[in-house]
């Protein structure tokens, strides 16, 4: 059973890496130039700070998941002897997985909120609607946000697996005592 959980976790991590890289590529390569009143105007992800932040967050999250995938493949071939050190590593993985899930989800929500302002505009602040002028730009950002939320769901399942791997080491009868 443990080997199948490791394989499932590796497959989910690989899928997460693909979705995060796809999100970062869709955001990073997104720009559109239009001629408006004989002036060329360019819409880019750099114009929206939330998209720049999401680009950095998804890139770091993909690197973290790649590192965890390499570490789990290494630890599958090497079995440690200390149960206590394995518990510390399980706690570290659990906390880092939780932090990465929250960071990616928060980055996606911030980018979604910023994208809604770009989509609808705001007259009080004199922010214009972009999506009626830059349709491909907005469509590509929408696709990247969809990929980002799918990656968040996949990372939530990874965090659930790491929680299972952590808490199954503890005794059900004695509080915070490792099983022997």
Swiss-Prot record:
Keyword Cell membrane: yes
Listed GO CC annotations: plasma membrane
Cytoplasmic topological segments: 1-7, 71-98, 162-180
Extracellular side: 29-49, 120-140
Topology within the bilayer: Multi-pass membrane protein
Keywords: Cell membrane, Membrane, Transmembrane, Transmembrane helix
Coarse class of the protein's main subcellular location: membrane
Pfam family of the protein (one): CASP_dom
Transmembrane regions listed in the UniProt entry: 8-28, 50-70, 99-119, 141-161
Protein's cellular compartments: Cell membrane
Complex and partners: Homodimer and heterodimers.
Family: Belongs to the Casparian strip membrane proteins (CASP) family.
Name of the protein described by the UniProt record: CASP-like protein XL3
Gene: XL3
